[in-house]
Amino acid sequence: DRIIIGSHSEDASNALTNLYQMIYKDKNNVKIEKTTPINAELVKYVTNAFLAVKVSFANEIYSFAKEINANYNKVIELAMLDKRLGTTHWSVPGPDGKMGFGGSCFPKDINSLINSFRDNGIEPKVLEAAWLRNLTIDRPEKDWLELKGRAVSNEDSE
């Protein structure tokens, strides 16, 4: 949907903008935005942390719905009629068939944001609660640890 380019160099951000415009020329809905590196980094953390919190919230609602014999899928289908809620990250279990969030980005990014909050004297209560729920209730097996140290590459990706 969007590409965020973080750079202090106008030449570099223009070059990247041109490259991405060539790559995504057939996709009119990809928006390219330029900003500072710190803003771009924070956008990534904010996006992933928000989605991680949303996954934790969905899992909590799922548990409650199950307990009171409500149909979680119907509740979410009807709740999503409110466009402010968005339509992604409501599936319980998730696309990997598991509860909570894993993968290579959500656990890393939510923890980076938690630590950055603390480093700046801010209590990250909501982020900590989502992380604690993920660790203790939804995904205590911590399967994301298996992904540490892996290389990012297109080789052998078939």
Please name every model-derived segment.
Residues D1-T88, S116-E123:
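Internal alpha-helical scaffold of NAD(P)-dependent oxidoreductase catalytic cores
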Residues K66-E158:
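NAD(P)-dependent Rossmann-like dehydrogenase/reductase catalytic/cofactor-binding core
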